Protein backbone atom coordinates (compact mmCIF):
# COMPACT_ATOMS: atom_id res chain seq x y z
CA UNK A 1 0.00 0.00 0.00
CA UNK A 2 1.25 3.49 -0.87
CA UNK A 3 1.46 5.93 2.03
CA UNK A 4 0.04 9.38 1.40
CA UNK A 5 2.18 12.28 2.62
CA UNK A 6 1.25 13.52 6.07
CA UNK A 7 1.40 16.59 8.28
CA UNK A 8 1.75 14.49 11.45
CA UNK A 9 4.78 14.54 13.73
CA UNK A 10 7.04 11.68 14.76
CA UNK A 11 9.49 11.02 17.61
CA UNK A 12 12.20 13.22 16.06
CA UNK A 13 9.95 15.52 14.03
CA UNK A 14 8.23 17.79 16.54
CA UNK A 15 5.43 19.13 14.32
CA UNK A 16 3.51 22.01 15.87
CA UNK A 17 6.24 23.11 18.30
CA UNK A 18 5.57 26.74 19.22
CA UNK A 19 9.09 27.79 18.19
CA UNK A 20 8.43 26.33 14.73
CA UNK A 21 5.04 28.08 14.48
CA UNK A 22 6.53 31.44 15.44
CA UNK A 23 9.46 31.04 13.03
CA UNK A 24 7.12 30.20 10.15
CA UNK A 25 4.68 33.04 10.89
CA UNK A 26 7.43 35.66 11.30
CA UNK A 27 9.75 34.66 8.49
CA UNK A 28 8.48 32.17 5.94
CA UNK A 29 4.71 32.18 5.47
CA UNK A 30 3.36 33.62 2.23
CA UNK A 31 -0.43 33.73 2.58
CA UNK A 32 -2.15 31.73 -0.13
CA UNK A 33 1.10 30.42 -1.64
CA UNK A 34 2.26 27.11 -0.18
CA UNK A 35 5.01 26.72 -2.79
CA UNK A 36 6.56 30.08 -1.81
CA UNK A 37 6.21 29.19 1.88
CA UNK A 38 7.90 25.81 1.29
CA UNK A 39 10.67 27.47 -0.73
CA UNK A 40 11.31 30.00 2.07
CA UNK A 41 11.49 27.24 4.69
CA UNK A 42 13.81 25.17 2.48
CA UNK A 43 16.19 28.09 1.90
CA UNK A 44 16.37 28.73 5.64
CA UNK A 45 17.36 25.15 6.46
CA UNK A 46 19.74 24.91 3.49
CA UNK A 47 21.44 28.24 4.23
CA UNK A 48 21.40 28.39 8.04
CA UNK A 49 21.91 24.79 9.20
CA UNK A 50 25.49 23.55 8.85
CA UNK A 51 26.08 19.99 7.62
CA UNK A 52 27.70 17.58 10.11
CA UNK A 53 28.98 14.16 9.07
CA UNK A 54 27.62 11.34 11.26
CA UNK A 55 25.23 8.42 10.83
CA UNK A 56 21.56 8.19 11.76
CA UNK A 57 19.52 10.57 13.89
CA UNK A 58 21.28 12.19 16.85
CA UNK A 59 19.19 15.30 17.52
CA UNK A 60 15.77 15.52 15.93
CA UNK A 61 14.21 18.68 14.54
CA UNK A 62 14.19 21.00 17.56
CA UNK A 63 17.75 20.31 18.72
CA UNK A 64 19.02 20.64 15.14
CA UNK A 65 17.43 24.10 14.99
CA UNK A 66 18.91 25.04 18.37
CA UNK A 67 22.42 23.91 17.44
CA UNK A 68 22.14 25.09 13.80
CA UNK A 69 23.86 21.92 12.55
CA UNK A 70 23.04 18.33 11.70
CA UNK A 71 23.55 15.48 9.27
CA UNK A 72 21.13 14.58 6.47
CA UNK A 73 18.77 12.75 8.87
CA UNK A 74 18.54 15.60 11.35
CA UNK A 75 18.30 18.26 8.65
CA UNK A 76 15.48 16.21 7.09
CA UNK A 77 13.74 16.07 10.49
CA UNK A 78 13.94 19.85 10.81
CA UNK A 79 12.78 20.56 7.26
CA UNK A 80 9.91 18.06 7.54
CA UNK A 81 8.85 19.48 10.94
CA UNK A 82 8.78 23.05 9.62
CA UNK A 83 6.96 22.12 6.40
CA UNK A 84 4.38 19.98 8.20
CA UNK A 85 3.89 22.68 10.86
CA UNK A 86 3.13 25.06 7.96
CA UNK A 87 0.43 22.60 6.85
CA UNK A 88 2.38 21.15 3.92
CA UNK A 89 2.18 17.34 3.60
CA UNK A 90 5.75 16.09 3.35
CA UNK A 91 7.56 12.79 2.87
CA UNK A 92 11.02 11.77 3.95
CA UNK A 93 12.92 10.37 0.95
CA UNK A 94 15.63 7.74 1.31
CA UNK A 95 18.30 6.90 -1.26
CA UNK A 96 21.60 5.10 -0.82
CA UNK A 97 23.03 6.32 2.51
CA UNK A 98 21.11 9.60 2.32
CA UNK A 99 17.81 11.21 3.42
CA UNK A 100 16.06 14.32 2.08
CA UNK A 101 12.50 15.68 1.97
CA UNK A 102 9.64 15.76 -0.52
CA UNK A 103 6.90 18.32 0.18
CA UNK A 104 3.76 17.59 -1.82
CA UNK A 105 1.81 20.66 -2.90
CA UNK A 106 0.76 20.86 -6.56
CA UNK A 107 3.45 18.23 -7.27
CA UNK A 108 6.36 16.59 -5.45
CA UNK A 109 9.33 18.88 -4.77
CA UNK A 110 12.52 17.00 -3.90
CA UNK A 111 14.40 19.16 -1.38
CA UNK A 112 17.87 18.30 -0.11
CA UNK A 113 19.13 21.03 2.26
CA UNK A 114 22.56 19.50 2.92
CA UNK A 115 24.38 21.49 0.23
CA UNK A 116 24.04 25.21 -0.53
CA UNK A 117 24.32 24.49 -4.26
CA UNK A 118 21.06 22.50 -4.22
CA UNK A 119 17.90 24.22 -5.39
CA UNK A 120 14.30 23.91 -4.20
CA UNK A 121 12.67 20.99 -5.99
CA UNK A 122 15.87 19.98 -7.78
CA UNK A 123 18.47 18.30 -5.55
CA UNK A 124 21.61 16.77 -6.97
CA UNK A 125 23.56 13.70 -6.00
CA UNK A 126 25.77 14.09 -2.92
CA UNK A 127 27.01 12.25 0.17
CA UNK A 128 26.42 8.92 -1.57
CA UNK A 129 22.71 9.64 -1.99
CA UNK A 130 21.01 8.46 -5.14
CA UNK A 131 18.12 10.72 -6.10
CA UNK A 132 17.18 8.54 -9.06
CA UNK A 133 16.41 5.45 -6.97
CA UNK A 134 14.66 6.25 -3.72
CA UNK A 135 11.73 5.40 -1.46
CA UNK A 136 9.24 7.71 0.26
CA UNK A 137 8.34 7.47 3.97
CA UNK A 138 6.24 9.36 6.53
CA UNK A 139 8.82 8.82 9.28
CA UNK A 140 12.55 8.35 9.74
CA UNK A 141 13.15 6.17 12.78
CA UNK A 142 16.90 5.73 13.12
Residue positions per predicted region:
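Short, solvent-exposed mixed-charge patches
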Residues: 1, 141-142
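Secondary-structure boundary elements
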Residues: 1-67
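Catalytic cysteine-centered active-site loop
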Residues: 51-62, 66-69, 73-76, 89-97
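Hydrophobic/aromatic-rich core segments of domains that either
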Residues: 74-141
